[in-house]
């Protein structure tokens, strides 16, 4: 998420235009630009900062964020990216992910789960950090997919950290839920009602699939998770979930 002060008072110029001037040789403007955008950098870095007592500005994370912002200025190409701030956000996040890979004391590619959800002590975090997921975490798209999925779950009052608890233990039950979710997503009326009103229309659903209302209610959370997955192009995340479930 971009910081609210995305446009600073440079006579009405956008960050992208400022960076173009800097790249044309205005080094003094570069120093002022970085200083003015420290709140923007802090906003991104804070998502990765797990300490509750330490000073963020004295942390390694902050230093990495500053270096990444400078790197973004040096590498930005207006012909490839129209928005400098979006490009800078991507570079900072990538560098933070690289940092947590390298500093993991147990050799896993572990990223602080607070980046996706405020609750750290969960079974799902254990499952994620105990798997070898280097290939998936190498993809910035995976991080974006996971974060987006988490936000969509929260809109239903669900948490990504409880995902393993939502899943039925038996394979046949999981397959049944998959079938139900597919039917819901395929039916525009039922699915629109689920997205807007946050409930499943059992009367309408019973017309297209033979399932008991209690079964749907018992597995409501998992069915909603599946509906979100089927409705979105989470290629990396779906591949990763196969390793968990």
Swiss-Prot record:
Pfam families: Sigma70_r2. Keywords: Cytoplasm, DNA-binding, Sigma factor, Transcription, Transcription regulation. Residues 202-221 bind DNA. One of its GO terms (molecular function) is DNA binding. A motif (Polymerase core binding) lies at residues 60-73. The keyword Cell inner membrane does not apply. GO terms for biological process: DNA-templated transcription initiation. The keyword Transcription applies. It comes from the Bacteria. InterPro entries: RNA_pol_sigma-I, RNA_pol_sigma70_r2, RNA_pol_sigma_r2. Negatively regulated by the anti-sigma-I factor RsgI5. Binding of the polysaccharide substrate to RsgI5 may lead to the release and activation of SigI5. Signal peptide: none annotated. GO terms for cellular component: cytoplasm. Induction: Up-regulated in the presence of xylan. It is found in: Cytoplasm. HAMAP family: Sigma70_SigI (MF_02064). Sigma factors are initiation factors that promote the attachment of RNA polymerase to specific initiation sites and are then released. This sigma factor is involved in regulation of cellulosomal genes via an external polysaccharide-sensing mechanism. Interacts with RsgI5. Belongs to the sigma-70 factor family. SigI subfamily. This is RNA polymerase sigma factor SigI5. The gene is sigI5.
